[in-house]
From Swiss-Prot:
UniProt cross-references to Pfam families, sorted A to Z: GntR (PF00392), UTRA (PF07702)
Transmembrane helix as UniProt keyword: no
Ranges of the DNA-binding region feature: 40-59
Limits of the HTH gntR-type domain: 12-80
Protein name (record): Uncharacterized HTH-type transcriptional regulator RB1450
Entry GO MF terms: DNA binding; DNA-binding transcription factor activity
GO biological process: negative regulation of DNA-templated transcription
């Protein structure tokens, strides 16, 4: 069971702390026996808060699609299993989701040509200031936003990356359109943190939700970096699986 203590002096609203704990309890299967979140009065007693605070937490979780109020019954869990996303030598979004979802969606939010900054230049092995193609994207499974990413590609080699991605909806296919038929994952760093305002909006999360951020580099088979990405996954919808 998830610890029910909330901290009144930690700078995070009580309802957000409670929403986090209920979200984790749902994820852990603590309420699976009934399929219902405990009554508001019970939650208020467990957390040591009033019912209004509990209602605010449940309303936030309802906005995420995690729970649903049912008249005369209480709050029902709309539990959807996390999809398992493998990180391996050949990491591909659509192949990674496999048969876990019926429909995979990708959206190009924006693109630009930008100069390589220090960290990104180092990751791609290019001098600072080198022109890069920047893509901002959101990916979903069965209509649920799963991740949002900002990715960078050497502009000299992948000049049409934005146009190809917009048309094909796939990084792998956009690479192939530039003559790159295969590429591999070189490195992946993973951190977990609270979602920022833009991520809450793009992933349709409530305040206090957690994202897992990966910073990754892909390279061609000769070892030349071709992509640097910063991807944020909704932690209550995706679990990352490291394959070696």
């Amino acid at each position: 069971m998830v610890a029910k203590v909330v901290e009144r002096q930690m700078g995070v609203a009580l309802w957000r702390q409670i929403a986090d704990r209920i979200r984790l309890a749902i994820s852990n299967g603590d309420y699976d026996a009934t399929g219902m979140v405990p009554p508001e009065t019970a939650l208020a007693a467990e957390f040591g808060v009033n019912r209004h605070t509990v209602r605010s937490a449940l309303a936030a979780l309802a906005e995420e699609g995690l729970v649903r109020a049912v008249q005369g019954r209480g709050t029902m869990i709309e539990r959807k299993d996390r999809v398992s996303y493998p990180i391996s030598r050949r990491t591909r979004f659509s192949q990674g989701l496999g048969r876990q979802v019926r429909e995979i969606g990708t959206e190009l939010l924006g693109h630009a040509q930008v100069p390589a900054s220090g960290e990104i230049a180092t990751a791609l092995g290019v001098p600072p200031g080198t022109p890069l193609i920047e893509l901002s994207t959101v990916s979903s499974g069965d209509g649920r936003p799963l991740s949002t990413a900002v990715s960078y590609y050497p502009a000299e080699r992948f000049a049409r990356m934005a146009e190809e991605y917009a048309q094909l909806g796939s990084v792998t296919k956009a690479f192939a359109a530039h003559g790159l038929d295969d590429y591999v994952r070189v490195s992946t760093e993973i951190v977990a943190r609270h979602a920022e305002a833009e991520e809450l909006s793009l992933l349709k999360l409530s305040p206090g939700a957690i994202v897992m951020e990966t910073q990754s580099v892909n390279a061609d088979l000769e070892g030349r970096p071709v992509e640097y990405s910063r991807t944020r996954f909704a932690a209550d919808r995706v679990k990352l699986r490291i394959e070696t």
